[in-house]
Amino acid sequence: MRTRPLLLPLLITTLAAGGLTATASTAEAATVVQVSTAAQLKSALTTVGPGDTIRLADGTYTGNFKTTAAGTSSSRITLTGSSKAVLTTTGGGYGLYLNGASYWTVQGITLTGGQKGIMMDTAVGVTIDSVTVHGLDMEGVHFRRSSKDGVVKNSRIYDTGRDGRGMGEGVYVGTAGDLSDNSDRVQILNNTIGPGVGGENVDVKEGTSGTQIIGNTFDGSGLTGAHYDDSWVDVKGNDALVENNTGTHTSNTGYETHTQQPGWGCGTVFRSNTSDLSDDPGALQLAFNITNYQADSCPTTVYASNTVTGGKGLTNIAVTP
């Protein structure tokens, strides 16, 4: 059902076509689009505008779903449903592709199958809340091509990177080797990532700044060692905050910083994280492996509020009280 609530009760027109019902008025207002089939969902993704909501009925929606429609900072577009509303993809591609589709909220649904779960390109201010993403060949959620000010929170991501190439990151920010991808100020909050993630739980690329990784639970039991994935979190961007996370089951270290391009991988702050390295089989077995520390030109701060169980130690740089 497609419903336009009336601002003025002057005129009501009801249209029925293809299972969609619309109520309209001379005064424009937000639209709620009720969908229950993949065809209806694809149609809705092409027609929504600022303030509109797409509400998914429980069921399976098979296909690759994409949109270029954009909301605004004051009038967002919402795609919502329960965890029993499942977007499933066969034969590759993205489950949900927000291409230039800024100011969306994606809430509650499940995405599975295909190459990647949720992909954002040049999509500013996207919020992903309470979704489940699993069963993918590659990464779960990817903020790319300067998708700034995004949020992924309260979500569960597991069983990614099933093709074994080490490209199954849970959350991926930016683009490897591309300093023009300024997917800045992405917030990764209160998610459960893993098990079965065939890459870092979170990978923050050079060219991005201000990523916040807070309150997450990491399980690295899916790490493969391919493409150097041997930690829960890999930070190659600048000025990241990594705080109040809990990690178990890694293959070498908990968190790492790297300089892949000159001037990047600097300014990370690690605070109040809890690391369990009790079953870590790696050579380093450090909670925080800081590979690029330079006090003046490329600082990293590891606070004493971080704790580690098992392994060979907290970090390889001086700890800040």
Predicted segments — roles?
Residues 66-67, 90-97, 113-119, 135-144, ...:
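Extracellular beta-strand/beta-solenoid scaffold signature
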Residues 52-55, 263-268, 274, 278-321:
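Acidic, glycine- and Ser/Thr-rich low-complexity intrinsically disordered tracts
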Residues 30, 34-42, 55-58, 63-64, ...:
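Right-handed parallel beta-helix/beta-spiral solenoid domain characteristic of secreted/periplasmic
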